[in-house]
Every structure is written in structure tokens, then in C-alpha cells.
């Protein structure tokens, strides 16, 4: 071996793994990296699969953080929740960037393998559905999509019936002494949240006296961050779909771009947006 080809190996580097776990074993890379099964011979289908699988991994982490944050807020541990929610926002920014990679797929390339997808669609992503549930956008009718898998259906049913991030945030307002209407506190949490004047009045007071309600103010801003990022993700999703398939119907049966444009108007924390006008 020539002098300039020598590999410098530090003395402490481990090389014997006969009885020790390797990096690949820890991450179960054999399983992870063998999960990209193309259904066509088209080169670009690999891009399509990897982008969506990577997004699902990020969504798994988002759910991990959201659920932990919800539990922390329930227990009045707001500071740890702030860290978790900040991490969610960082993950969201990462997922948004992935649309730039998928956008390198042209209409001519996608049409070569689109039929291989059958009726499979991102609309069926159960993790995305659970994220919506965790944020308070409850859609009971969507459970029908998951009836094929009883175990998965049960998990989504449980998520539908669990308090959302906004539910526990409103409870935090109550614990601070704000008078929230009983209809809000006793509402059916399996239904989409509807804005309420008493909740808006409470958040308005929080924003009007930040020093007094610093933790609630920080919580509110973390929620706004998450919804802001989610709306940006939805917009990039819509524009990427429009760029690749135009206004064709989605593989899952939706109206495609028209549907994605409509969901841009959905809000998770309406009062937090309203107070910005009223301050």
C-alpha cells in the first residue's frame, strides 16, 4: 500500500464484534433497508418509496414527542413539554424540505409507475391521522379506512378518544383560574374542536400580561409554531402534487389538489390566531 493510501486507524477503534452489538444491529438496518420493495421496474419508484418511508419515520417521532408533551402538560410539567414541542417543530421543518426532493420527480416519470400504487395513498397514513387527532382535528368517519387491520383500527380509535394537545392546554388555562365555559370542558372530544369565546378571552388575557402568565404564553407560542409549520407542510404537499399530477384525482379517491387546497383552511387552535387581531 502506498503511503498516501494508508488509512489512519485510532488505537481505540473497536473492530471485533463477534460478541458485541454493531451499529447496524442496533438500528436493525437489515430490516429497515430491505423494506423498499418496488412494484415496477421504473428507476424513480425508489425515490417515491424512500421519501414516504422517511416521512413516516419522522411522523413516528412527532407522535412520540406530542404524546409525551400531552402527558407532561396534564401533570403541570410545562417546561419539559416546551422542549418536546420545540422538537416537533424542528422535525416538521425537516419533513417540509423533503418535498423539494420529491419535486424532482416529473409527471412523465411518475406516470410510469403510478398504476402500481393501486388505491394506496398518503391520505391513508395512519400516523398522520394520529397527529391530526393529537392536535385536536378529530374525524371519526376516517376510522373506516383502517377497518382492514383490527389492531390498527383499535389504536386509532383510542387516539380519537384521547384528549388532544389543545384539550390539555385549555385545562392548563382552567388550572390558572380562567373561567372556561362548561360546554368546552364537557364537550365530546371525538369531534372537531369549535372555537369558544371564553377560551379566546383567556388567551387574550395571557397575551395582554405575558409576565404574569409566562408559561401559558410560552405554551401558546409553541402551539402556534406547530400549526404554522403544519400549514407550510400542507401547502408544499399541495404544490408538489399539483406539479406532478396536476388536477387529477388522487390514487386514494380524493379530488387531489382541490382537496388539499380545502384542508389549508382547517385550523387547530383558532383562538390563538384570533387574539393576534384583537390585541
Swiss-Prot record:
<feature type="binding site" description="axial binding residue">
    <location>
        <position position="237"/>
    </location>
    <ligand>
        <name>heme</name>
    </ligand>
</feature>
<comment type="similarity">
    <text>Belongs to the tryptophan 2,3-dioxygenase family.</text>
</comment>
<comment type="function">
    <text>Heme-dependent dioxygenase that catalyzes the oxidative cleavage of the L-tryptophan (L-Trp) pyrrole ring and converts L-tryptophan to N-formyl-L-kynurenine. Catalyzes the oxidative cleavage of the indole moiety.</text>
</comment>
<dbReference type="InterPro" id="IPR037217">
    <property type="entry name" value="Trp/Indoleamine_2_3_dOase-like"/>
</dbReference>
<comment type="pathway">
    <text>Amino-acid degradation; L-tryptophan degradation via kynurenine pathway; L-kynurenine from L-tryptophan: step 1/2.</text>
</comment>
<feature type="binding site">
    <location>
        <position position="251"/>
    </location>
    <ligand>
        <name>substrate</name>
    </ligand>
</feature>
<comment type="subunit">
    <text>Homotetramer.</text>
</comment>
<keyword id="KW-0560">Oxidoreductase</keyword>
<dbReference type="Pfam" id="PF03301">
    <property type="entry name" value="Trp_dioxygenase"/>
</dbReference>
<dbReference type="GO" id="GO:0004833">
    <property type="term" value="F:tryptophan 2,3-dioxygenase activity"/>
</dbReference>
<keyword id="KW-0349">Heme</keyword>
<keyword id="KW-0223">Dioxygenase</keyword>
<feature type="binding site">
    <location>
        <position position="110"/>
    </location>
    <ligand>
        <name>substrate</name>
    </ligand>
</feature>
<dbReference type="GO" id="GO:0019442">
    <property type="term" value="P:L-tryptophan catabolic process to acetyl-CoA"/>
</dbReference>
<protein>
    <recommendedName>
        <fullName>Tryptophan 2,3-dioxygenase</fullName>
        <ecNumber>1.13.11.11</ecNumber>
    </recommendedName>
</protein>
<keyword id="KW-0408">Iron</keyword>
<dbReference type="GO" id="GO:0019441">
    <property type="term" value="P:L-tryptophan catabolic process to kynurenine"/>
</dbReference>
<dbReference type="InterPro" id="IPR017485">
    <property type="entry name" value="Trp_2-3-dOase_bac"/>
</dbReference>
<dbReference type="GO" id="GO:0046872">
    <property type="term" value="F:metal ion binding"/>
</dbReference>
<dbReference type="GO" id="GO:0020037">
    <property type="term" value="F:heme binding"/>
</dbReference>
<keyword id="KW-0479">Metal-binding</keyword>
<dbReference type="InterPro" id="IPR004981">
    <property type="entry name" value="Trp_2_3_dOase"/>
</dbReference>
<feature type="binding site">
    <location>
        <position position="114"/>
    </location>
    <ligand>
        <name>substrate</name>
    </ligand>
</feature>
<feature type="binding site">
    <location>
        <begin position="48"/>
        <end position="52"/>
    </location>
    <ligand>
        <name>substrate</name>
    </ligand>
</feature>
<keyword id="KW-0823">Tryptophan catabolism</keyword>
